[in-house]
Amino acid sequence: MRLAVALGERDPDSLDFYAGPEEVVAAVRGEPPSLRAIGLAAGALSARVSAERLDPAEASRARALSADLAAMMARVDLLTGTRLPYDKESVAFFGVAPAPIDERRLAQIRSQIADVVGHGGRLVDRYTTFAARFTVPADRLPDVMRAAIDECRRRTVAHVALPAAEQVTLELVRAKPWSAFSRYLGDGQSVIQINTDFRFTVDQALQVACHEGYPGHHTRNTLMAPRRDASARPPERSIQLMFTPEGLESEASAMLAADVAFSTDERVRFVRERLFPLAGLDAAGAQRHVDVERLVGELQMVQADVARRYLDGELEFARAVTQLEDRALVPHAEALVKYINQYRTYVTTYTAGRQILAARLAACAGPNPADDVRWRCFQRETLPRGAETIP
């Protein structure tokens, strides 16, 4: 825990949350180690973990600790000047690199989108114009987000045992590199921040509610982290480091949260009957809106490809922006490239990570699974054994 807190003090982007004893933070801040000292200590601890003779019940915990420590050392190397090619950096942090993308399939998806939003001119412009019809007005966004969060929670607690006192608080912010962020405070409490510099369509608002809240980040963190009434959790569960294999699992599960909470028909029905009226928008196009957003979501793998080429020096800033607009239909492409400047290979977590987890869920649940099967597989594939049990 001390190493993770120390790294977070030196590099706030590395630490998603810490919900452990405050005295650890005080001790680190009283005598903060250098990045080099953190890297050396992580290496020494990794060697100790590897040398331990453990029973099978502890072996998986040791493997996870070793992977996180290796990723921590790689992060220290990056912060102290080491630069690796995108794929090697991604493997060092997350254990995986994005697979080559299927350009033919992506072209088919863009063609399907064009059939809905119209032909002629740049597709990103036509998609942006189409999406504007479903964009939540700024003054109505808080009500839409709260209703979406409430429904995502209602569906989640029907399948997942959450502690009675857990809750999320909604906060509107500006001038952030991301569109939304969930900050876990500990003991089942999170703050979901929504960046109002971005615009959200109705379906995107629902995706954010599930992703950041239920059954996404807040739910996962609540179930995994120790609480005052459940101190038996391993202490490392009090920490979420972003640039680790655990960080990839967390982001991948959040990316699929809306698909677990809602079938396609349920999703269309809820946005049409509940969110469109709250947004003050005509719900006649709800089906087409959800269909197009699903297709645009399938283009996200382009983001990893562009990030790889950009960070490896094959694309300059302006060309990276253009490729994100033309190939992935990203409306805030400049903001995304600035995000890549700051978070680099974290793009892997919500692109390749999503693909990997989606394949595991499909293998577990099979085609067209019933709700209870879908939820059971989601918990089994995204949470360590026992994390879903509330004492």
Regions found by a protein language model. Name each.
Residues M1-P391:
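N-terminal maturation segment of proteins
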